[in-house]
Amino acid sequence: MSLQKKISQELHVQPSIDPKQEIEKRVGFLKDYLKKTGAKGFVLGISGGQDSTLAGRLAQLAASELRQEGKEDAVFIAVRLPHGVQQDEGDAQLALSFIQPDKSWKYDIAPAVTAFSEQYQKDTGGPLSDFNKGNVKARMRMIAQYAVGGEEGLLVIGTDHAAEAVTGFFTKYGDGGADVLPLTGLTKRQGRTLLEALQAPERLYLKKPTADLLDDKPQQTDETELGITYNEIDDYLEGKPVSEQAVEAIEKRYVQSEHKRQVPASMFDDWWK
């Protein structure tokens, strides 16, 4: 078996999907898992990008259906987590209008990130690099979501999907920290087809994806940082032909980021050997 096929199988990617069936399955999964855990509902940070828009809408559909089925306390809370002023705030508001969450809260992570960065420099004698400060931002968002989840009895939703998983393009214990992952197995383009089926505004899934974590490179696109396109990543995952350069880049990132897809290593594990 080729490494390409092995990776696709491990990440549960299907070469083609039926968007409406996928929506139904993923909403059903959220409902079933919520019932199993005994939690009241879900919480998710909404950025205005494709992934949080899709995961947020699926969560709201799940909460709404659960209430109709008799779980009266089922709720979805969307949380805006800007770092100061977000340049694409309009997209975030458009996403909220589409998702129609039961509740929408806002928590500005900038004061907490600034306080941490200043204390770090004071106690270590050196500043955080822009890259590591970006990871602090992602982890601060995780902290905020888990604070809401803990206080309200909610599960934290993660937005990880196959195109991010294969490249390790997420912050460990940041946006990678979650209780439940409704987008697992989807490529980036497959996620777009689900949003199309849900009649989301085109602007939310046609915009260039950006993690927007770096102060020095605001709104830098994911593809610029990765050095490969999502079309190349999706083609690879869906078993289609891709250039040797893209294959090498994707597989190198997959191997290097294996630790992100595993629980912390112990001497009893063999995945790291």
From Swiss-Prot:
Question: SUPFAM superfamilies of this UniProt entry?
Answer: Adenine nucleotide alpha hydrolases-like (SSF52402)
- What is the superkingdom listed in this entry's lineage? Bacteria
Write down the Pfam families for this protein, in alphabetical order. Answer: NAD_synthase
Which terms in the GO cellular component ontology are assigned?
Answer: cytoplasm
Q: Which residues are recorded as binding Mg(2+)?
A: D51, E164
Q: Where does deamido-NAD(+) bind?
A: R139, K172, D179, H259, K260
Q: Which reaction does it catalyse?
A: deamido-NAD(+) + NH4(+) + ATP = AMP + diphosphate + NAD(+) + H(+)
MF (Gene Ontology): ATP binding; glutaminase activity; metal ion binding; NAD+ synthase (glutamine-hydrolyzing) activity; NAD+ synthase activity
Q: What is its EC number?
A: 6.3.1.5
- Binding, ATP: G45, I46, S47, G48, G49, Q50, D51, S52, T159, K188, T210
Q: What class of enzyme is it?
A: ligase
Q: Sorted alphabetically, which keywords does the UniProt record give?
A: ATP-binding, Ligase, Magnesium, Metal-binding, NAD, Nucleotide-binding
Q: Name one GO biological process term.
A: NAD biosynthetic process
Q: In which pathway does it act?
A: Cofactor biosynthesis; NAD(+) biosynthesis; NAD(+) from deamido-NAD(+) (ammonia route): step 1/1
So which residues are the signal peptide here? none
* UniProt keyword DNA-binding, yes or no: no
Q: Provide the function of this protein.
A: Catalyzes the ATP-dependent amidation of deamido-NAD to form NAD. Uses ammonia as a nitrogen source.
HAMAP family, per this entry? NadE_ammonia_dep
> How is the quaternary structure described?
Homodimer.
What family is reported? Belongs to the NAD synthetase family.
Q: What is this protein called?
A: NH(3)-dependent NAD(+) synthetase
User: Which gene codes for it?
Assistant: nadE
